Amino acid sequence: VRILSGERTPHNNPHAKGVFFGLTHQHGPAELARAVLEGVGYALADGMDVVHACGVTPESITLIGGGARSAWWRQMLADISGQQLDYRTGGDVGPALGAARLAQLAQHKEAVFSELLPQLPLEQAHRPDAERFARYAPRRETFRQIYQQLLPLMSS
């Protein structure tokens, strides 16, 4: 469970803590790094589940931010979530661009949304691989179970 400063969507738990589960002598720094990246993917997929439960089913989701620069990680996230994930030109500055676009919307309330906020050019679409998705599914369930079982210990 990769949590270092609390958990946000969908758990909203500022007391959540991170743990590594199932370590053996065979695990080294590479496996720990991969576990952190997978944990982020499981948490992202949990957030996507909430969106889907609200009746919103996007065809694809655009990844933004510095971490999204890694095509390898983007593919891992698609494989974990089972969702197509897109990377667009300028995605590494997406958070700042998103904030600027929200400011534009606040200033131009009557503007046509699609004209004010055009979609950035698609660089790469990451479609989930069915075999890897099936491999991640039980790990994701373990992630959920560990989080739930550790909840009573996280607030202390």
Predicted regions and their residues:
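Glycine/Thr-rich phosphate-binding loops that ligate phosphate moieties of nucleotide
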Residues: 1-156
